[in-house]
């Protein structure tokens, strides 16, 4: 039997959209977009973070003003309920994805199980 793993991945992608976790995230994101001022600030925060990360990846350091701007934007958006709700939904999706990743990669973990270091208390 020939298995096309990419067909399976595409089906998993489709099913992901049907999960409670994804639908909750989608609803939270729509609520954020509906709050125009908060959404604009959120986009500025995301862009400022991306710019700083890009600088770091190219060997540059963000300026003190850029860091202060990111901190101020983070403080402003993190206090908003719609952003807190979005972050809670992101955590739920992340938890689900971690479990999926654990399941998907279990054959690799099994393959290397003989050489994986044991943590204290494991048998």
Swiss-Prot record:
Signal peptide: none annotated. SUPFAM superfamilies: YheA/YmcA-like. Belongs to the UPF0342 family. HAMAP family: UPF0342 (MF_01526). This is UPF0342 protein Lreu_1268.
């Amino acid at each position: 039997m020939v298995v096309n793993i990419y067909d399976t991945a595409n089906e998993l992608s489709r099913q992901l959209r049907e999960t409670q976790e994804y639908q909750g995230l989608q609803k939270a994101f729509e609520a954020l977009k509906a709050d125009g001022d908060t959404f604009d600030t959120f986009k500025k925060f995301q862009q400022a973070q991306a710019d700083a990360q890009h600088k770091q990846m190219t060997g540059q350091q963000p300026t003190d003003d850029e860091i202060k701007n990111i901190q101020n934007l983070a403080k402003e958006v993190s206090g908003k309920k719609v952003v807190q709700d979005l972050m809670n939904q992101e955590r739920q999706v992340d938890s689900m994805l971690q479990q999926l990743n654990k399941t998907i990669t279990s054959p690799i973990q099994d393959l290397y199980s003989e050489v994986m270091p044991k943590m204290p208390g494991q048998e």
